[in-house]
């Protein structure tokens, strides 16, 4: 059975540094579980790790697709499983590091995407239907077959509306029902999982998030978004809806001021961290590491290593 170490937690909690230190001590390689860092050219807004910051540790699933390309949890699972096997077969430890809980769950709950993978013709039909009759009409199709998705999704979120309709067409189940069934496969995985969640005092975390946004602005987030626009990437693309990118686009479009954009990025990032923590708390397999209780990252790393070896 493959040993799999997972380091997760909210944005800006310090997953990168901890995972690199662990990789150095455990002869590991890192697989990113971040839904924004998979996109090429989107470096500043995603807080993407630099080559220098990697400290020679190989990183996987970073800069995987172009910003206009489709990438979802099914794509992540397939690529992550390949990387895990490759790393393990070379005698190294695969370490998953990131904050996208759905990506992590797809591995440790062994989500099965074979039944409801793709129906390109149906997707094309729905997309054309949205053009002809409007997004509201396509959204209304959910009402009788998947009321939960109908209530939760907005008509403008066409990608997810189409996905929910697609899953129902292929499986006859709502997307939430399908996901819950997958989650029942809790232990049906080929991994010996050691799953750690990093956390810290909420006020300190929010301060770190605010500071990170200021650093992003100083590094040239506005210029990065301008460059992406010049390359033909548009606000309707999933990648450009990410926190930081959508707000800067609003600013560049004249809808809000720069100060408002910065405020919204900070607020959106803090709310995202809150949602991440809520998600991670639902998982009973994870061990929580309160960073405030340790004097240094080295202490945290040593504690994690000890718990892994004592398991």
From Swiss-Prot:
Entry keyword annotation includes Magnesium: yes
GO biological process: one example: tRNA modification
GO molecular function, one term: ATP binding
Segments of this protein annotated with the region Interaction with substrate tRNA: 34-37
Subunit structure: Monomer.
Binding locations of substrate: 11-16
Species annotation: Clostridium botulinum (strain Langeland / NCTC 10281 / Type F)
Catalytic activity from the UniProt record: adenosine(37) in tRNA + dimethylallyl diphosphate = N(6)-dimethylallyladenosine(37) in tRNA + diphosphate
Binding site for ATP: 9-16
EC number: 2.5.1.75
Family to which the UniProt record says this protein belongs: Belongs to the IPP transferase family.
UniProt-recorded name of the protein: tRNA dimethylallyltransferase
């Amino acid at each position: 059975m493959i040993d799999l170490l997972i380091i997760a937690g909210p944005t800006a909690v310090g997953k990168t540094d901890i995972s690199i230190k662990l990789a150095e001590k455990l002869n590991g390689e890192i697989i990113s579980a971040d839904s924004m860092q998979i996109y090429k050219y989107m470096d500043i807004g995603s807080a993407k790790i630099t080559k220098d910051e990697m400290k020679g540790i190989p990183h996987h699933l970073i800069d995987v697709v172009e910003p206009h390309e489709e990438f979802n949890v099914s794509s992540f699972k397939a690529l992550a499983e390949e990387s895990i096997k490759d790393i393990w077969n070379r005698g190294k430890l695969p370490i998953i590091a990131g904050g996208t809980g759905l990506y992590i769950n797809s591995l440790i709950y062994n989500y099965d995407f074979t039944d409801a993978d793709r129906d390109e013709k149906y997707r094309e039909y729905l997309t054309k239907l949205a053009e002809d009759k409007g997004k509201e009409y396509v959204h209304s199709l959910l009402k009788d077959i998947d009321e939960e998705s109908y209530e939760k999704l907005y008509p403008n979120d066409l990608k997810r509306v189409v996905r929910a309709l697609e899953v129902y067409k292929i499986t006859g189940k709502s997307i939430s029902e399908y996901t819950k069934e997958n989650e029942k496969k809790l232990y049906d995985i080929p991994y010996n999982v050691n799953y750690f969640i990093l956390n810290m005092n909420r006020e300190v975390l929010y301060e770190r998030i605010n500071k990170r946004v200021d650093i992003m602005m100083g590094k040239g987030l506005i210029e990065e978004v301008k460059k992406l626009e010049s390359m033909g990437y548009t606000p309707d693309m999933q990648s450009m809806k990410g926190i930081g990118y959508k707000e800067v686009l609003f600013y560049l479009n004249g809808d809000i001021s720069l100060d408002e954009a910065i405020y919204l990025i900070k607020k959106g990032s803090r709310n995202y961290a809150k949602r991440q923590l809520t998600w991670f708390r639902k998982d009973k397999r994870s061990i929580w590491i309160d960073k405030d209780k340790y004097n240094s990252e080295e202490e945290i790393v040593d504690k994690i290593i000890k718990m892994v070896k004592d398991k």
